[in-house]
Amino acid sequence: MQIPSSLQSSLQGQNQKAELAGHLLSTLTTYKYPEHGPSVLEVVDIQKKFQHFQALTHINLDLKAGEFVSFLGPSGCGKTTLLRIIAGLEKPDYGKVIKKGTDITLLSAEKRHCGIVFQNYALFPNLNVEENIAFGLDKKKWDKAQRIQRVQQLLELIELPDIAKKYPNQLSGGQQQRVALARAIAPNPDILLLDEPLSALDAQVRLNLRQRIRSIQSQLNLPTIMVTHDQEEALSISDRVVVMNHGVIEQIDTPHNIYYKPQTQFVAKFIGTMNFLKANCAVPNQLDVLGFIPLNLEQQKLKTGQNYSMGFRPEVVELVDDFGSDKESLYLPIKVLSTEFLGAKRRLFCAIHIDGIEQAKHLLQIEIENTKFKSLQELMFIKVPNQLIHVFDQQGYALC
């Protein structure tokens, strides 16, 4: 795979920083290069520090035409700082922001032709909806007829055609956010930037509005970046997700791969739920889980004498009565401590059961169909197919 020259040149000398090598490797091996034409936006080796706090470290990513990308991560991971650098509201200490082949790193925000929607809407309280939406059009000197036509077109697009004369304090939170979205896209920006646009709304409004945002974005074929800490939000509407942690990119991938093929232990922990158990490699191609339960992984390059962490999702588990003998699955003895009714499914909280003793430090979550949940026994077993098990090395990087 050909690495873009701008990215290749900017990365020279990075390998000298040993403490960052792992994260750089993770970023580069999951970096998705454009397959069909040039990128709309490239972020090349961006770094940012606030006094003694390293906010961003060697950030590399791209945005394609019509693509919806989410920056996902916990508070303080650097996702909003990265968005602000792309928007021109912050300047990086090092690196470049390239839009349609032009270096815009030092270009002011108003000249970048990006629409921005903030968490707090930022509508002008003294202007009505029509005037709020038209604010950017007035600055670009649209004539009156064009402005009226564009505002009405956008009100139809956000499905609020009759509120043009209302003021922000007369609107619900969801309506205000839709007006903020209309204002951002009114001047036909090249890129739309969304900074946690739904976090101030209640759950049902968020669900409806995120689908509306995605629908509008798709209709306009508008390249979009959204910052969020909500996993479901990012996975449900994004073409790709950028998972960030402590100022670095852990993984850039499709929502499907982020969930089913996490490249680091952090991604596996942060996205959904995963059960982790310690394991070590005493003989080639085999892990001893908890020191005594064999797990055969013939296709994996395990190093004898090394410790590993293995994990599996709650929904891939099958509850069985006996310890199986097949080598294609991992069997674990468990005792069910409590359950939660989830409608069609039931969540079980279990402890590994060794020599008749519950191992409190080895607690597991599993999910099964409610119809398969009959009764609790003193000792039961779970079955996990080997191909659905994830193995991570001591540095937290995935082997499978």
Regions found by a protein language model. Give the residues of each.
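Conserved ABC transporter NBD signature motif
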Residues: 95-103
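ABC ATPase nucleotide-binding domain helices that frame the ATP-binding cleft
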Residues: 80-83, 179
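ABC ATPase nucleotide-binding domains
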Residues: 68, 107-266
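Helix-to-loop junction immediately C-terminal to a conserved catalytic motif
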Residues: 87
